[in-house]
Amino acid sequence: MAEIDRWSNLHPDLLYQITEHLYSYHDYIRLRLVCKEWNSKLSSIPNHKRNPWLLLPGTTHDSSLSHILEKEQIYHVMFPDFDINDNLIRGSCHGWLITVVISEGAIRMLNPFTKTHIDLPPVSTFPDVVRYHPDRHGDEYVLVDLYNDVIYNLDAISFHKYEIQKIVISSPPDNDDFMAVAIYKECGKLAVCKLNDKRWTHIPTEQMSTFFQDVIFFQDKIYALDDDTSLYEFDKKVIMDELGKKPRPQLVPLLTSIGGMCEAPPPAKLTMYYTCSMNKYVIGCVDGSLLMIVKHNDWAMEMLHVCNKFDVFKLNKNSKEWSRMHSLEDYAVMIGYNSSVQMFPGKSPYCKRNHIYYTDNQVVLHTLGKPSLQDMGILNLEDTNTNEILPNVEWVCPPTWLLP
């Protein structure tokens, strides 16, 4: 008994130092199970290790089985109320998955580690919805085209499938300044919400034709990248203040204090390419700079594309010009449906420096409702070799990178 007491009375600082030498989530869980005191002292999610995990949604209808792959280890996480065929993954941030429930239009945040969920405002509350009639089967939505103001009708299932391109969150939902931002519509517009908001609010831009491909939260700003690789910056605090006004605005006002297009023009090299065949991602770095990752795609067969190559550009803090990068040095990046992030692998055996971890985020392909191949892998920038991940497996719900 005295031996057990010595373990349970271990100082929290020393216990935390032990966790710093654990790179496997499996080992971390086993450490928490040593005794009740350790289980209560250690959080359910390790907050010091950020290894990229690949979430592989199961394919069965009535058992919502997810597999988290960490090198050779696979962890099984059960969500009793999660139907793979009725959910679209549209984001992964801070250990949370963001999904759209096709049948009802709910937008749900799921935590695979704690098995908790939180709802964001539903799809029916997006700014392009004029009216929603849930009882009008096949004609539930009256919508407005934000580009030319044309009014049209659409059935609920189609709208729920195609409305959301991607959602990222600023922090875990228990933070007071929590905010979510969505890229929505085929034309790639931005909308935001706070926790407990009833609806989404549009963020306007001076350029009506702007088509955003990626968005992140970084240093109290929202950065968004459009299909022409133009960078936009918005002030998160100013937007939060606008959302807190009474009555609640239908859209964030087009104010200079909100932000807009940055002065840094797109990299000249990219003007040579047909930009629609690219996926663009923006990433915040620990030194305050921004990275732009451009993924070039080749169409291998009908409704399937594969990565051809990557271009990496860097925008230093206070700079107005992107510079070409040939190395990520001691860092790695992770892109896809997840919030685009930079990682420091350190000595971790599960994450390698100077590598790009990528998954597919082709929204149109993923809303067809049938299994399909996914373009995902790990690229070594040093020798440009790519390790494809499960290239011959078809998925109903696309795999997604996840950071605890």
Q: Each predicted region: which residue ranges?
A:
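Hydrophobic beta-strand positions in blades of beta-propellers and related beta-sheet-rich domains
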Residues: 62-66, 107-109, 190-192, 231-233, ...
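Inter-blade boundary loops/turns of WD-repeat beta-propellers
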Residues: 43, 70, 112, 195, ...
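Short helix-loop-helix/strand-helix junction enriched in hydrophobic and basic residues
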Residues: 12, 27-46, 61
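A sequence/structural signal of beta-propeller blade repeats
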Residues: 83-300
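An edge-strand/N-cap motif at the start of beta-rich repeat modules
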Residues: 50-58, 62-70
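C-terminal closing repeat unit and adjoining cap/tail of repeat-based domains
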Residues: 3-4, 67-70, 82, 88-91, ...
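CRL adaptor-proximal regions
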Residues: 1-10
